Amino acid sequence: MTINALLLSSSRVGDTPYLAHAIPFIKPLTTNAQKWIFIPYAGVSMSYDNYLASVVTGLSELELDISGIHQHPDPQQAIKDADGILIGGGNTFHLLHQLYRYDLVTLIGEQVALGKPYIGWSAGSNVSGQSIRTTNDMPIIEPPSFKALNLLPFQLNPHYSNYQAPGHNGETRAQRLLEFTKVDPLTPVVGIVEGSALWRQGDKLSLLGDQPAYLFCGEQQEIPIPVGSDLSHLLKA
């Protein structure tokens, strides 16, 4: 089997309904996978039940059987029994902390490597990379390690935008990612803009959506990646 993983930048684009823009991206992964497990651990300011309800409503037209991992007495068995895995956005540090707490990091990687579809957005995309070192989130809790699922052998930065409000003197996103590349010049970072996604199908990696992505690696800074690009070469990073 081969990896089938969809990494969405965000759950919304502008004022669109929750996950509405992502339906065309998600649908191809659900053809033979109807029983999905949703992992809400990134949700800190909402209850897991409410988070699950939002996802079920947002994906209702796909007619999937979605349950929350928090509803199962054995989280590891729930992962094994599901046809596919969904991980939502929120705080990436809390998400990874809980994945380690329930000993799910290695298991999810193994299950996805066997062909189980994986769909993540925002924090759920952050944890698909080598590590969470390029998340935008505040480190509200300390996971045992920053090492993540490694479904992609590089770093991701969802919600990518280099906008700087007039009069604001903090660093831009590009400046923050430059800092990363100074410390680790050999590891690529792909910034994915809201409304776009990366789709890994085995040895193929594609940029989906109508927005460019941006590459940061060593001396290469904020290099535009055109819409529809084949990024398979990054799987050899």
Curated annotation (Swiss-Prot):
<feature type="active site" description="Charge relay system">
    <location>
        <position position="159"/>
    </location>
</feature>
<dbReference type="InterPro" id="IPR029062">
    <property type="entry name" value="Class_I_gatase-like"/>
</dbReference>
<keyword id="KW-0645">Protease</keyword>
<comment type="similarity">
    <text>Belongs to the peptidase S51 family.</text>
</comment>
<dbReference type="InterPro" id="IPR023172">
    <property type="entry name" value="Peptidase_S51_dipeptidase-E"/>
</dbReference>
<keyword id="KW-0720">Serine protease</keyword>
<feature type="active site" description="Charge relay system">
    <location>
        <position position="122"/>
    </location>
</feature>
<keyword id="KW-0378">Hydrolase</keyword>
<keyword id="KW-0963">Cytoplasm</keyword>
<feature type="active site" description="Charge relay system">
    <location>
        <position position="137"/>
    </location>
</feature>
<keyword id="KW-0224">Dipeptidase</keyword>
<comment type="function">
    <text>Hydrolyzes dipeptides containing N-terminal aspartate residues. May play a role in allowing the cell to use peptide aspartate to spare carbon otherwise required for the synthesis of the aspartate family of amino acids.</text>
</comment>
<dbReference type="Pfam" id="PF03575">
    <property type="entry name" value="Peptidase_S51"/>
</dbReference>
<dbReference type="GO" id="GO:0008236">
    <property type="term" value="F:serine-type peptidase activity"/>
</dbReference>
<dbReference type="GO" id="GO:0016805">
    <property type="term" value="F:dipeptidase activity"/>
</dbReference>
<dbReference type="GO" id="GO:0005737">
    <property type="term" value="C:cytoplasm"/>
</dbReference>
<protein>
    <recommendedName>
        <fullName>Peptidase E</fullName>
        <ecNumber>3.4.13.21</ecNumber>
    </recommendedName>
</protein>
<dbReference type="InterPro" id="IPR005320">
    <property type="entry name" value="Peptidase_S51"/>
</dbReference>
<dbReference type="GO" id="GO:0006508">
    <property type="term" value="P:proteolysis"/>
</dbReference>
